[in-house]
Amino acid sequence: MKLDTDQKLPAALLAVQARPLTNTEGVQVNDCYISDLLSDVLARAKPGMLWVTVQIHRNVISVAATNDIAAVLFTCGRQPDASVIAEAEAEGIVLLTTPLTTYEAAGKLWQAGIHD
């Protein structure tokens, strides 16, 4: 099932038991990219994507802002510190966390229609 863009973030939140760390209102995602290698994300992630990673440091926000990534989902229950969350809010990037592994999250996101 292919979802409309405005349905994808709510579907993603439900699919992976995500907990928002920043405001999600009005944010839309159009696809998903999964990688822990920042240079890979810089080279391949597209604007408006949901980025799935275990990385929680401030460089994640810089990469997300550079590529105009709509939201970042941290897996394995990982959560960045308050300064990283504040930086994401200032950049308008949604941060989410899930207790699922990256592999589990990938499967559930695909099943929920979070793909192009």
For the regions a language model picked out, list residue spans one by one:
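Feature captures the catalytic cores and cofactor-binding loops of soluble hydro-lyases/lyases
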Residues: S35-L50, V54-D116
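Conserved catalytic and cofactor-binding micro-motifs
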Residues: M1-R44, L109
